[in-house]
Amino acid sequence: MTGGKSGGKASGSKNAQSRSSKAGLAFPVGRVHRLLRKGNYAQRVGAGAPVYLAAVLEYLAAEILELAGNAARDNKKTRIIPRHLQLAIRNDEELNKLLGHVTIAQGGVLPNIHQNLLPKKTPKSGKGPGSQEL
């Protein structure tokens, strides 16, 4: 039966398995492959490239979400908001380098007070009238 609505699948494939599940990923390998082909990055795209790229993207997303979840927990919140993403990215040296020129809407800025603006610390010496030294 040629030209039917088989969708290009091999005949007799009982349990079809996605490339994402084969690779053990949550990110869609098929969609990444399609975007690599349509993006005019190269004439041809190898079979391993979208799997690798999907794995890298999944790792980066998991890393950012873990740090943002920690920031939300530090602020006693149960929901991650853009402020938590901003704090997570800017406090991590490598993520800040990677996403240095990225603006996060509603992210705010990192809290920072210059040392010259902080109140002076007065040294408290133990040499007073109540000193017990001999």
UniProtKB/Swiss-Prot annotation:
Q: Which family does it belong to?
A: Belongs to the histone H2A family.
Modification note: Phosphorylated to form H2AS128ph (gamma-H2A) in response to DNA double-strand breaks (DSBs) generated by exogenous genotoxic agents and by stalled replication forks. Phosphorylation is dependent on the DNA damage checkpoint kinases mec1/ATR and tel1/ATM, spreads on either side of a detected DSB site and may mark the surrounding chromatin for recruitment of proteins required for DNA damage signaling and repair. Gamma-H2A is removed from the DNA prior to the strand invasion-primer extension step of the repair process and subsequently dephosphorylated.
Q: Where is the composition biased (Gly residues)?
A: 1-10
Q: Where in the cell is it found?
A: Nucleus; Chromosome
Q: Which organism was this protein described from?
A: Aspergillus niger (strain ATCC MYA-4892 / CBS 513.88 / FGSC A1513)
Q: What is this protein called?
A: Histone H2A
Q: Where is this motif: [ST]-Q motif?
A: 131-132
Instruction: Please give one Pfam family short name.
Output: Histone_H2A_C
Entry's Gene Ontology molecular function annotations: DNA binding; protein heterodimerization activity; structural constituent of chromatin
Q: Which InterPro entries match?
A: Histone-fold, Histone_H2A, Histone_H2A/H2B/H3, Histone_H2A_C, Histone_H2A_CS
Residues the record annotates as the site (Not ubiquitinated) are: 120
* Residue positions, PTM N6-acetyllysine: 5, 9
**A GO CC annotation given for this chain:** nucleosome
